[in-house]
Design a protein with these regions (language model features):
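Short beta-strand elements
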Residues: 208-228
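Flexible glycine-rich surface loops and low-complexity tracts that mediate binding to linear polymers
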Residues: 55-76
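Beta-strand/loop nucleic-acid-binding surfaces
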Residues: 43-56
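Short helix-loop boundary/capping segments
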Residues: 111-169
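Short, solvent-exposed, Trp/other aromatic-anchored flexible loops in extracytoplasmic proteins
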Residues: 159-205
């Protein structure tokens, strides 16, 4: 019996010694980068205690990260283990007519997700790309408001690197990217607690019956509300 208790105690000690002392695993968040510290969209401050990425995140303005929360420093400050970091393009929306059409482009781009946080309109985008080509340009053009709805058009200049362009044929390579646009300060009055209606128009490919992309494109839109 004593031997059994000793074995049980040994197992408890082994589990305790091997336990990863982490408050939360796999936290994901958008954050601004300020002097090597992450300031998340919900107002928390993350200090990087361990960096397990090979990214150059310190040179970025904004990032989408996956991390483990290790320790709490204060009410809203934590030490974290950084496990994954993606660069997020931070860019101001441009007024309609402020940038020439040939610079903006109108090539296909897909909005796969969109949400508002941290004072930003955040978009996850998908484009067809070839790694050897020059970087694509993304802009969010502010259109005139219509019936209380804030209207935008997402513009994409691929410099000829899109499906349907000469030399761009299947199999295709796709790139996912994150872009954050500061929410404009001159929004119309909100409709009660529901927020301000918003519409983002963009152009993306048609698909066949099996879900495969076709070279032809169509107008699409993402709608939602911006909290006030």
């Amino acid at each position: 019996m004593r031997r059994g208790w000793l074995l049980f105690l040994f197992l408890l000690l082994a589990v305790a010694c091997g336990r990863d002392d982490v408050i939360l695993h796999g936290e994901t968040t958008m954050a601004d980068i300020r002097d090597g510290v992450l300031v998340t969209d919900n107002g928390l401050t993350y200090h990087i205690a361990e960096d397990r990425t090979s990214s150059e995140w310190k040179s970025w303005q904004r990032t989408f990260v996956t991390c483990d929360i290790l320790r709490q420093r204060s009410d809203k400050a934590f030490d974290i283990r950084l496990t994954e970091a993606h660069s997020v393009l931070r860019k101001e929306p441009v007024p309609e007519g402020a940038v020439p059409d040939e610079t903006l482009g109108d090539d296909p781009v897909q909005i796969t997700a969109g949400w508002v946080s941290g004072g930003y309109l955040n978009l996850m985008l998908r484009v067809v790309y070839r790694p050897e080509d020059e970087p694509h340009l993304i802009n969010l053009v502010r259109l005139p408001d219509e019936d209380g709805t804030v209207r935008f058009r997402l513009r994409h200049n691929s410099h000829g690197d899109y499906y349907g362009a000469p030399g761009v044929e299947p199999p295709l390579s796709f790139g996912l990217s994150y872009v954050s646009f500061p929410v404009p300060a001159d929004l119309p009055a909100a409709d009660g607690l529901a927020g301000v209606p918003v519409e983002i128009r963009y152009r993306w490919h048609l698909t066949d019956g099996n879900g495969n992309l076709l070279p032809e494109t169509e107008e699409k839109s993402l709608t939602g509300r911006i909290p006030r």
